[in-house]
Amino acid sequence: MARYIGPKHKLCRRVGRPLCGSAKCPALKRPYRPGQHGPGRPQKLSEYGAQLLEKQKLRFIYGVMERQFRRYFEQAQRSRGVTGEVLLQLLEQRLDTVVYRLGFARTMAAARQLVGHGHVTLNGRRVDIASCQVKPGDVVGLTQKARSLAVVRESLDLRRPVPPYLSLDETTMTSRLQRLPLREEIPVDVDESLVVELYAR
């Protein structure tokens, strides 16, 4: 599956906020577009510009390329429920996202790498596809080798709160997706209705 391999902090600065999960993200000090010599006078975005910005933010947060993102949107459109909320649920059901929410990795990119290197199991079977959809009732876990990895231990030591829709057994390092997340349980500062409006144009 294709992925963005360019400079991550450049994306953060493009949207004006840290999306990479790093505490040292340059966007915290310089929340303006890269290439500008200083913040300058803020420009008012057009309606299309605001919609595009929200879509790009969502794509960058989850590390999804445009073609795959559109597929998620089309799937959300076909599903019952509010399209924007269903879109977020589909993105939250990605295996790499679940691994990140469980605190097994510090960033979404690190979670994707953990999955890609075969350190994650789904219902007892090793899976190396980050975009694999986790369904309610599925059990996500770490391989025996992954449990002793320094990067995993360091991430778990941060003690990030686990969302209420996931149950984590710290003894076995496994988690069950109890249900689909509610909108207020998804910690993403994005107006998904603007994304829906963009694709409806």
Swiss-Prot record:
NCBIfam families: PRK05327.1, rpsD_bact. One of its GO terms (cellular component) is small ribosomal subunit. Part of the 30S ribosomal subunit. Contacts protein S5. The interaction surface between S4 and S5 is involved in control of translational fidelity. PROSITE patterns: RIBOSOMAL_S4, S4. CDD domains: S4 (cd00165). This is Small ribosomal subunit protein uS4B. Keywords: Ribonucleoprotein, Ribosomal protein, RNA-binding, rRNA-binding. GO terms for biological process: ribosomal small subunit biogenesis; translation. Residues 93-156 form the S4 RNA-binding domain. It comes from Symbiobacterium thermophilum (strain DSM 24528 / JCM 14929 / IAM 14863 / T). InterPro entries: Ribosomal_uS4 (IPR022801), Ribosomal_uS4_bac-type (IPR005709), Ribosomal_uS4_CS (IPR018079), Ribosomal_uS4_N (IPR001912), S4_RNA-bd (IPR002942), S4_RNA-bd_sf (IPR036986). One of its GO terms (molecular function) is structural constituent of ribosome. Pfam families: Ribosomal_S4, S4.
